[in-house]
């Protein structure tokens, strides 16, 4: 999602492939996959981020997600 990252593409792609394999194994629908991704994000924010920073980080995360979407241009 971010343009620059302290993590390598290889690190991210490896974990993404493993998570994708688990979702595929369970035949997770797009809706279930998004629900799981949202729950993971919520749990990380609530358990690993200071309460004073949660909203700011959640807003930045949401904006990065929106920015990364491939949306067709209207004519």
Curated annotation (Swiss-Prot):
It comes from the Bacteria. Pfam families: DUF1414. Belongs to the UPF0352 family. This is UPF0352 protein VIBHAR_03027. It comes from Vibrio campbellii (strain ATCC BAA-1116).
